[in-house]
Amino acid sequence: MDVQTRDGRSRNHPGYLWQYGTPGGAAIFEFRMGRGREGPMRFLENFAGILQTDAYAAYDRVGGPKMVHAACWAHSRRRFVEAIKLNQQDVASTRIVAQMAKLFAIDAQARDENMNFAARHALRRQRAPSVLSELKAQIEAASRTALPSSPLGKASSYTLRLWHKLTRFFDYAELELSNNLAENSMRPVAIGRRNWTHIGHEKAGPRVAAILSIVETCRRLKIPVREYLAAVLPGLANLSFQRLPELTPTAWAATNL
């Protein structure tokens, strides 16, 4: 998003919102004036768990020894879909997208049947190996025949390069196939960017991030935002700093919903 310069006359400069979150949990936005790895490196310095991202290079050196880095199948699929849009006769991309649909269908079945992680893990182990084997064979075949600079060639290279990260879900039942949840959380930012035009000062960035964190966490937890704010704001000034965690959307939902 554009950030207005201090004098208000010079050209605006870019600011960036980074978003971190967990399925069924909070969404945390962090404002940074740069797009380099310094932001996620600092935020995730002591993180122990699974980090699912796209292939942006800034994520390659973040996290500690207890962090597992996973990739997103939706980002891979999108590249083959774009190849089809550019060439309707791209049989290889069409077949690959159809094979990916079989992979997503496994998790769709788990959702439809309200499976817990253990049951989903068993279903994946039963059905995913053959799907993945055929999918990888199709992509490897495409990579041998497509020009490296073509959309199909780039999509194939991208997917094969990230294959070990894309298949992490096979070992971690709690890992989703895609990080669409995070991408969906960024849509209000994209809409707002068109409406806001810019933010007035870089010091306003963290405040914007805090507001977005509260609103998006409420949305994820199905908390009525107005009801939540009406409940927590009146007593906020009289609450000690140590007790502020009691007023987060997650904590409030645990006792009020």
Kindly give the residue locations of the regions a language model identified.
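Catalytic center-proximal scaffold of phosphoryl-transfer enzymes
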Residues: M1-L257
